[in-house]
Amino acid sequence: MKHIRNFSIIAHIDHGKSTLSDRLIQVCGGLTDREMAAQVLDSMDLERERGITIKAQSVTLDYHAKDGNTYLLNFIDTPGHVDFSYEVSRSLAACEGALLVVDAGQGVEAQTLANCYTALEMNLDVVPVLNKIDLPQAEPDRVAAEIEDIVGIDAMDAVRCSAKTGVGVDLVLEEIIAKIPPPVGDESAPLQALIIDSWFDAYLGVVSLVRIKNGILKKGEKFKVMSTGQNYNADRVGIFTPKEKDKTELRAGEVGYVISGIKEIHGAPVGDTLTHAKHGADKPLPGFKRVKPQVYAGVFPISTDEYESFRDALNKLSLNDASLFFEPETSSALGFGFRIGYLGLLHMEIVQERLEREYNLDLITTAPTVVYEVIMNNGETIYVDNPSGLPALNNIEEIREPIVEANILVPKEYLGNVITLCIEKRGSQTNMVYHGNQVAVTYHLPMAEVVMDFFDRLKSTSRGYASLEYNFIRFDPADMVRLDILINGDRVDALAMIIHRSNIRHRGLALVEKMKELIPRQMFDIAIQAAVGSQIIARSSIKALRKDVTAKCYGGDVSRKKKLLNKQKEGKKRMKQVGNVEVPQEAFLAVLKLND
């Protein structure tokens, strides 16, 4: 066991995690040069297109070190984006150490900090690596000082490498062996294996990635899942090199996969412990903290007959994405669908895109809302994640909105823009620290504002240099109201939103104007109104299309024309009473894009 090293790679977006992992695989001969593709571990098409890592992936490599021994390296490539931080904490639970990769040109960013603190809290050894030293703008000494100053770990003798050109990658491997401790565990103890990740394979059933903490899991043995108490047979065990490679057993300290033909989707939940069916361990391993969804949105299939396949797709996806939450929902405008809870807007986009791609569904999403805490007049507390579930205002004592603590790292010259943006988003500043050229500011902001478009606006006001990391801290009382859209006096439930009272005029007008552009003209007038309770705050009308009924009168008496016009008027009146307005799908999407 002293020749095993388990580590993960953590870094901010675009600091070169995936490229560095490619190099490590190449140096250790995990794949032949012919099989090497850029970003080997980003296996989803979506990951490659966007250039981001979404799912953590694991690889086991053999490394012949300079001290003459052969070491077994298990490493896990992790996502860098704030929405996927739970993936990072899951990966770190399986490791003894982490490589903190920092771009020698960009320096420390907020996400680097957040992931690094997660690693330090889990008592992992953090090894700093300065990447991209081949760039002309690289300043390794300044960045090393910055790491010491902001993160507080010793970085003066940090390894300097360039994952792109391959310079210094062997030094990184030597550093891993020197600085990261071997795993502790007892091979003779009862089996305890932590499930780090699972996914569903159409042929094999559920495939689980496990880290063996104690004991040995042999091929063909019976094991049980501790949370459900179900027993299964380990049909295949093995490691990823990144290709699947079957083995006869997985020993304590190793990371590998188990395939046992589990067909029910939640048979082996992530964070669970496996043990032997007979003479197993008594206690499960401490799992991960369940992440609570921060943002909810209704998602509906465009054609109602896709509902069943939509449900199956969500079940399969939630196995692979442990943070997804969903429950059935119906809407008078959109039919049957699900209310889905996400970790953030990027997560929401990715989930929708994965559903559309991997399961061939056509979906429509309503405007996202955060969870509000509502105190009723009778003293009970309810949590509302859907605008249509908000009780009438006269029954409510107060509404409390979720507040996040946002840590923003920004170069000095853009500080003014960032502060202006935070004030506009109803934020209050709690802290500001200067680190050389960077400033770390801490703001308390309403989550609803952060969720909408804060990240994009932050990037554009700072030319992409500011970086953001946030977490939920508390609920605060706020003057929130529900804005309804009425079309010819009928509320459209899918367009309702909960917003702050200071924004209603501006938001209501913008929405009404947008709807006016998108709803096609009918044979009768359509009134579009924005209302809060019974008070109408904005209105716009779509004029009726009309046929020129007097065209066939040549000259003649005016009373003849009047008669025809009046007859038309009567018809329009009747039509308006019975006619209903189809709201096109673009209109629902427009609500999401209102701020663009």
Curated annotation (Swiss-Prot):
<keyword id="KW-0997">Cell inner membrane</keyword>
<keyword id="KW-0648">Protein biosynthesis</keyword>
<dbReference type="Pfam" id="PF00009">
    <property type="entry name" value="GTP_EFTU"/>
</dbReference>
<keyword id="KW-0342">GTP-binding</keyword>
<dbReference type="InterPro" id="IPR035654">
    <property type="entry name" value="LepA_IV"/>
</dbReference>
<dbReference type="InterPro" id="IPR027417">
    <property type="entry name" value="P-loop_NTPase"/>
</dbReference>
<dbReference type="InterPro" id="IPR013842">
    <property type="entry name" value="LepA_CTD"/>
</dbReference>
<feature type="domain" description="tr-type G">
    <location>
        <begin position="2"/>
        <end position="184"/>
    </location>
</feature>
<keyword id="KW-0378">Hydrolase</keyword>
<comment type="function">
    <text>Required for accurate and efficient protein synthesis under certain stress conditions. May act as a fidelity factor of the translation reaction, by catalyzing a one-codon backward translocation of tRNAs on improperly translocated ribosomes. Back-translocation proceeds from a post-translocation (POST) complex to a pre-translocation (PRE) complex, thus giving elongation factor G a second chance to translocate the tRNAs correctly. Binds to ribosomes in a GTP-dependent manner.</text>
</comment>
<keyword id="KW-1003">Cell membrane</keyword>
<dbReference type="Pfam" id="PF03144">
    <property type="entry name" value="GTP_EFTU_D2"/>
</dbReference>
<dbReference type="Pfam" id="PF06421">
    <property type="entry name" value="LepA_C"/>
</dbReference>
<dbReference type="GO" id="GO:0003924">
    <property type="term" value="F:GTPase activity"/>
</dbReference>
<dbReference type="InterPro" id="IPR000640">
    <property type="entry name" value="EFG_V-like"/>
</dbReference>
<dbReference type="Pfam" id="PF00679">
    <property type="entry name" value="EFG_C"/>
</dbReference>
<dbReference type="InterPro" id="IPR035647">
    <property type="entry name" value="EFG_III/V"/>
</dbReference>
<keyword id="KW-0472">Membrane</keyword>
<feature type="binding site">
    <location>
        <begin position="131"/>
        <end position="134"/>
    </location>
    <ligand>
        <name>GTP</name>
    </ligand>
</feature>
<dbReference type="GO" id="GO:0043022">
    <property type="term" value="F:ribosome binding"/>
</dbReference>
<dbReference type="InterPro" id="IPR031157">
    <property type="entry name" value="G_TR_CS"/>
</dbReference>
<dbReference type="GO" id="GO:0003746">
    <property type="term" value="F:translation elongation factor activity"/>
</dbReference>
<dbReference type="GO" id="GO:0005886">
    <property type="term" value="C:plasma membrane"/>
</dbReference>
<keyword id="KW-0547">Nucleotide-binding</keyword>
<dbReference type="GO" id="GO:0097216">
    <property type="term" value="F:guanosine tetraphosphate binding"/>
</dbReference>
<dbReference type="InterPro" id="IPR038363">
    <property type="entry name" value="LepA_C_sf"/>
</dbReference>
<dbReference type="InterPro" id="IPR000795">
    <property type="entry name" value="T_Tr_GTP-bd_dom"/>
</dbReference>
<dbReference type="InterPro" id="IPR004161">
    <property type="entry name" value="EFTu-like_2"/>
</dbReference>
<dbReference type="InterPro" id="IPR006297">
    <property type="entry name" value="EF-4"/>
</dbReference>
<protein>
    <recommendedName>
        <fullName>Elongation factor 4</fullName>
        <ecNumber>3.6.5.n1</ecNumber>
    </recommendedName>
</protein>
<dbReference type="GO" id="GO:0005525">
    <property type="term" value="F:GTP binding"/>
</dbReference>
<comment type="similarity">
    <text>Belongs to the TRAFAC class translation factor GTPase superfamily. Classic translation factor GTPase family. LepA subfamily.</text>
</comment>
<dbReference type="InterPro" id="IPR005225">
    <property type="entry name" value="Small_GTP-bd"/>
</dbReference>
<dbReference type="GO" id="GO:0045727">
    <property type="term" value="P:positive regulation of translation"/>
</dbReference>
<feature type="binding site">
    <location>
        <begin position="14"/>
        <end position="19"/>
    </location>
    <ligand>
        <name>GTP</name>
    </ligand>
</feature>
